[in-house]
């Protein structure tokens, strides 16, 4: 959790795992989370499958769990970034001027994947993404 201290907003792309995780994150900053395929218990019913977040006056983010479920053209829809999860494979990619970001997984190690999260700093309207390795 130390890596998230000082965050203005926390976005979670699903596979939260428990209501306690959300509670702990909300102690650090406001949280917007979507439901992942492992979020099947009653606490997760309030989570939507996708969210739109205005990160600042110029940057609107689209958050979903599975990138395969993306059913819109992000640039045409006015999104600066698409935040997604599911694979737990951290990735930063730019497509047609839109940031595609998978923060990976900050929870228990999955398979042989690294334990990571991502931060996006917005400076003068420019998105500056970074993958942070926790282990």
Describe the role of every protein-language-model region.
Residues 17-21, 38-44, 68-73, 83-94, ...:
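Active-site environment of divalent metal-dependent phosphoester hydrolases
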Residues 32, 38, 47-63, 67-82:
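Glycine/small-residue-rich loop that forms an oxyanion/phosphate-binding "nest" at active or ligand-binding sites
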Residues 30-32, 99, 128:
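Conserved beta-strand segments of alpha/beta enzyme cores
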Residues 9-15, 32-36, 62-65, 81-86, ...:
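Active-site neighborhood of phospho(di)ester-bond hydrolases with catalytic His/Asp-centered motifs
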Residues 27-29, 78, 96:
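Short, structured coil segments at secondary-structure junctions
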Residues 52-56, 77, 94, 101-135:
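Binuclear metal-dependent phosphoesterase catalytic core
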Residues 1-55:
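Core catalytic region of metal-dependent phosphoesterases/phosphodiesterases
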């Amino acid at each position: 959790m130390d890596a998230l201290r000082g965050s203005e907003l926390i976005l979670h792309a699903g596979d939260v795992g428990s209501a306690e995780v959300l509670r702990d994150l909300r102690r650090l900053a406001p949280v917007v989370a979507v439901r992942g395929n492992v979020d099947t218990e009653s606490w997760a019913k309030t989570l939507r499958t996708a969210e739109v977040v205005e990160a600042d006056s110029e940057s609107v983010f689209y958050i979903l769990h599975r990138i395969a479920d993306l059913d819109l053209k992000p640039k045409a829809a006015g999104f600066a970034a698409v935040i997604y999860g599911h694979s737990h494979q951290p990735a930063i990619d730019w497509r047609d001027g839109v940031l595609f970001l998978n923060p990976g997984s900050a929870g228990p190690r999955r398979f042989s994947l690294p334990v990571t999260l991502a931060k996006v700093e917005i400076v003068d309207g420019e998105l500056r993404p970074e993958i942070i390795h926790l282990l």
